[in-house]
Amino acid sequence: MEAICGVSFLGNCARSGTVILEELGAEHLRTGKPILYTSADSVIQIAAHESIVPLEQLYEICRRLRGLADRERIGRVIARPFLGEPGAFRRTANRHDFAMRPPETVLNRLEAAGVETIGVGKIGDIFSGSGLSQSLPTKSNAEGCATMDRLLAENPDRPRLLFTNLVDFDMLYGHRRDPAGYARALVEFDDWFGSRLPGLDSETLLLITADHGNDPTWRGTDHTREQVPLLMKGPGMPRNLGARESFADVAATVAEWFGIDSRGAAGLAGLAGKSFLA
């Protein structure tokens, strides 16, 4: 990895992102060497202080590692910039994920069918841009909600999917085990969401869920295992959607709503979820 990137790394171990800054942040400031680490997820993470390694240089290091990560089937290479001094380091909102390009997804089928697919927040990073007509990165829940407000106020000339990720719950409050901050963020989102809900018409399908848990009251700093919420506003509501067998059910529901085939090409059985609309 050092040969590919042309730099020497610190770390090269499995650690929590916050812990490794405590352990190696001061040495990074002294040597200028980026910190390389991994975690329980399928990731390579590169941390660097923004005053030591400029953002574009950090991103370029991650781009170079993406080829190696593809070969080893590693899901993401994550740039983890931070600021601050020893004892008070803080990760910034300039994180950037370089993900493995996924196989065909419902997003690709929507785009091919003429549906405008817009990713807000980390969605462009997660899907490596695949199947997205437009990617709108954001740095906070507030910016994500403001972007949604702007998009919902528009009158598009074709069907549109808005796919938004609100990162603060996970990044700022889950991993950092800040239950008070998590609660405030939930209240803020609930206020925003509640005021927008009456404005959604019968031609709009709304789905809210999460890709994993991150209990801010649990020990450690990693993701936690619990059932995630699944809320829908659309035809046949209200009713209990029950506990689903697969995230693919969300994709199947979106595919049915837009009138496309969710099954994909031959052999992609992973797309064959069960629509909530059925």
Language model features by range: what are they?
Residues 1-278:
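Feature captures the catalytic ectodomains and active-site-proximal regions of enzymes
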